[in-house]
Amino acid sequence: MAETAPLRVQLIAKTEFLAPPDVPWTTDADGGEALVEFAGRACYQSWSKPNPKTATNAGYLRHIIDVGHFAVLEHASVSFYISGISRSCTHELIRHRHFSYSQLSQRYVPEGDSRVVVPPGLEDDPELREILIAAADASRATYTELLTKLEARFADQPNAVLRRKQARQAARAVLPNATETRIVVSGNYRAWRHFIAMRASEHADVEIRRLAIECLRQLVAVAPAVFADFEVTTLADGSEVATSPLATEV
């Protein structure tokens, strides 16, 4: 019986900032937030912080977002390793073209024991879950049968790696959209804000919405001055959404 895979989002990289020693400026933040402030001040050489309202890093970044100077947000980035996400969800995710992706390859990784991501609409219904798991088991059995026969068909191929790849790339056609995949996603702060605004909305598919909100929670921990304007609320159906009056790039 196919195992189910829960969503897991792991922070694996974030920006480090190294202040140039010859610039007469300090800040009360570090990492990506400091870099964004530095980039903004570099545009105007405002190292002396002449405006009291933007003298702190949080005040400066709030002003940057308020006035729509989003270009400076592109200097800082965050990377996540995401597992427990379905292939159907990553088909939506990779439409965000400002991100960089490295996804599990079904041509190289055998999927005979792959896990299944249960869609949100089926989670609380044992009968529907059972139907889903049965369908996944049937497709995996067909995948395994096809793989065996395809490897035999390509037996004349002397390169064993190529032979297995040719078999897997054909057999994977029968795998369901619910098959778990794993993916590394890297993006700058501006791209992440756009993703959250688009995919944490009540109009988004629930699976990618959950992903967006989990990413948001971790982004707030990394760069609160950049992401804390998003508010997470719960809808009548129990699902969560995140919105911000400052998320103007949608």
Curated annotation (Swiss-Prot):
It comes from Mycobacterium marinum (strain ATCC BAA-535 / M). Homotetramer. GO terms for biological process: dTMP biosynthetic process; dTTP biosynthetic process; methylation. It holds the Pfam family Thy1. Its cofactor is FAD. Belongs to the thymidylate synthase ThyX family. FAD binds at residues 95-97, 103, 188-190, 194. Keywords: FAD, Flavoprotein, Methyltransferase, NADP, Nucleotide biosynthesis, Transferase. The keyword Flavoprotein applies. HAMAP family: ThyX. Gene3D superfamilies: 3.30.1360.170, 3.30.70.3180, 6.10.140.450. This is Flavin-dependent thymidylate synthase. Its EC number is 2.1.1.148. Catalyzes the reductive methylation of 2'-deoxyuridine-5'-monophosphate (dUMP) to 2'-deoxythymidine-5'-monophosphate (dTMP) while utilizing 5,10-methylenetetrahydrofolate (mTHF) as the methyl donor, and NADPH and FADH(2) as the reductant. Residues 7-233 form the ThyX domain. One of its GO terms (molecular function) is thymidylate synthase (FAD) activity. DUMP binds at residues 92-95, 103-107, 172, 199. The active site is at residue 199. Pathway: Pyrimidine metabolism; dTTP biosynthesis. It comes from the Bacteria. Binds 4 FAD per tetramer. Each FAD binding site is formed by three monomers. A motif (ThyX motif) lies at residues 95-105. It is an enzyme of class 2 (transferase). Coiled coil: none annotated. NCBIfam families: thyX (TIGR02170).
